[in-house]
Each structure stands twice: as C-alpha cells, then as structure tokens.
Amino acid sequence: MADSALSIRTIDESDMPEFSRVMAWAFLDDPRGVDSKWLKVLEHDRAHAILDGDEIIGTGGVLSREITVPGGLQVPAGAVTVVTVKPGHRRRGVASLLMKTQLHGMHESGEPIAILWASEGAIYRRFGYGELATSLNRMTMPTRMAFHPGVPVSDTRIRQVTREEALPFMREVHDRVRRTKVGWLSRVEATWEVQLGDREVDRNGLTSYRYCLHPEGYVVFRVKGGGGPRGPQDELHVRELVCETDQAYADLYRFLLDIDLATEISFYTAADDPILHMVDNPRKVGRDLGDALWLRIVDVDRALPLRRYSSDVDSVLEVEDSFCPWNSGRWRFTVKGGEAVVARTEDPADVSLDVAALGSAYLGGVRLSVLKRAHRVVEHTPGHVDALTLAFIGVCEPHCPEVF
C-alpha cells in the first residue's frame, strides 16, 4: 500500500530537469545521456511523477505502441518505461502507486496488454507481469566461419552508406518486417533516435554506427578496436539486423563474417535464430539466454481474442488477479479455427492460474505445461493444460529486439 503522503500526476516540460535527475540516480546512469535520449520518447500525458510534497521521488511512463502477436496481428500495447524510485524512498509503495495508475488507465482506455523490460527480475510479477514473454539470446561468433554447403549466398552488393541515406530505407523495411515478427514493436520517429543514438556518450568507447544496406534488409553495427602482436582483433557489435527474406539474412551475415580485420561478432537475437543451423560448427557460437519482455494482460476478455491460436480448445480458466480485480474469476476460453472467444462463466474451472502466468504464455514462448510443473498453473481436469499448451504455442519464438 502506498504511503498516504505520496501523490502522483502527469508531467510537463518544467518537470524535465528533476525527472531526469531521478532517472539518472535510480539507473546509475550518466545524466547527460538521460536528458536528451530517453526523455525524447516520453509522452507527457502518459508520463508520471510520484511526489512527496513537492519533491519528485519516482518516475514512470507509458509509450503507445503496437506489438505483433501470433497470427501476424497488431495489438495496442502500453510499453512501460523509466520506472524509478529515488534512493532513500524505497518500501513506501511508490512502485505500487505507479503500477496501479498505469494499469487502471490502460483498462479505462481499452489498451489490452502492457509490456516492459525489467531492470530487476523480482519486482514485477507481483504486479501481474509474466516473465520470459520473450527471450533474448546474446550470441558471439568468430569471423570467417563457414556456412554449411546448403546455404546459398548471392552476389548482391551490400552498400555502406551514411546514416542520412540509410534511415528512410530502414524505416520502410523495419515497418514491413515488424508486422511479421511476434514480439516486435511499432516505432515512432523519436524511437529511431533512441535506438540508434550516436553521440559520444552513447558509444561506450566504440566507433560510430556503420550502416550497410541490402535490397531486402540492413545491418547496423559499431566496431570495438583491438589488436596486439598477432595483429588486428577488432570486434563487430551488431545493433540491428533486419531482413525481409532468408536470402538477405544469409547475405548480410556472410558480409559480417567476411569483414577484414574483425575477429568476432556479437549480437542480440531471438532464441531460435537460424544462424546456429547455418554455420558449419555451431559449437563455436557462444550463447547466453536471458529474459526480455515481461507482459501483463490488462483485460483478459480483450487480450486473448486478439491473437491467433494453433489448435482448437474449450477450457474454463480461473484467473487470479488481485491488482486488476476485473480479471479475477472464471472465463470460458474457446478456440475454433484459430480464433478465440472469451466469456464469463460459472462453470467449474478446468485450469487455475494467475494473470502473470497467462502473460508469460501470451506470445507463445512459454509453455503452460512448463508452468504447471513449476506450480504456477493448476490442472483440475486432466488433459486441459496440454490442450492449452498446444493452442498457445507459436510457430517461432517471440522476440523483441528493442529496449525501451
């Protein structure tokens, strides 16, 4: 419960200096980067300051986005960002007040899901966010790796261009591709500035971005210089690799692997990235899997019908949601031909789960059968968890390449 001395309101331009200082303190960030980077994307009517008297002690914002869900459909999502509490004011209910304000606002406006990146993994499940809604795979691989003989590489020329030349093409390609990739988000102009910020403070000792265009895709990367008695040992740090076709994907990876003077490539990608099955020795590829998006079902009856499902099912779900009580209770969830109908019911429950477990499974990356084994899902009618698992599972692992 929030401290009764606290208040919450939306921000205006005059709040920005103090708002950014609180963010920098909480994230242990460089205030120079916070001022002009993250604040560019904030929507003032959806950004909140939590105050103790006149002092801002907490921050939070919601970005209006679309997320691609199974079936290639676009669903409005509240992308929760810059959630901070000023040191010295923890355990006063600051985060609870912010979360309640955000989620109740999304419910009233009809935004069916909320998403966020969690800086600390123990915080958000209690607010109904499901972990591992998407996963993020950090890969490192040595250059000069060969593809197996079945991978075609075309002679298409990949052009190295300026940022100004690249951006119009990249915007168009990204918007087409993100509509086909589960977990990808829409972008507004300010998002491009954040994702590809290229001031000195953004580079962490690396070079400025290189922009390389294929007719059906692009790659953006920085270089970390290195070397010694054995010669150059530069590293390529890929920021984005976006492709409309499998051929462009193979061509761009081959381009990166063959860059002179580089010895290693590092990049963040989907858990099921096909590059592991393209190279001739996948054991040389380093992998480090972690959580990415956390997803919160704001309205069960709105969110579940907005995606497509892999098999028919008819189950009664008993959902527990203490933070958004309109979701609590029993729902008949019926899928036929990939489309779902959700309605209140008094029938006995086949499966019980909390709203966070439902959020983890929503994009198809977490199996409800696994959550059952983890004691997060309870089966009352034998066979229903397996049937629901098959319905929710997607044809690919969900992935969100964009931190917000």
Q: Which functions belong to the PLM regions below?
A:
Residues 1-16, 70, 149-404:
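Intrinsically disordered, low-complexity, positively biased terminal segments
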Residues 82-85, 91-104, 246-257:
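Conserved acetyl-CoA-binding loop-helix of GNAT-fold acetyltransferases
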Residues 49, 55-64, 79, 84, ...:
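Conserved beta-strand in the GNAT
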Residues 137-151:
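Glycine-/small-residue-rich beta-strand-loop submotif within the FAD-binding core of flavoenzymes
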Residues 24-70, 183-210:
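Active-site rim helix/loop that mediates acceptor-substrate recognition in acyltransferases
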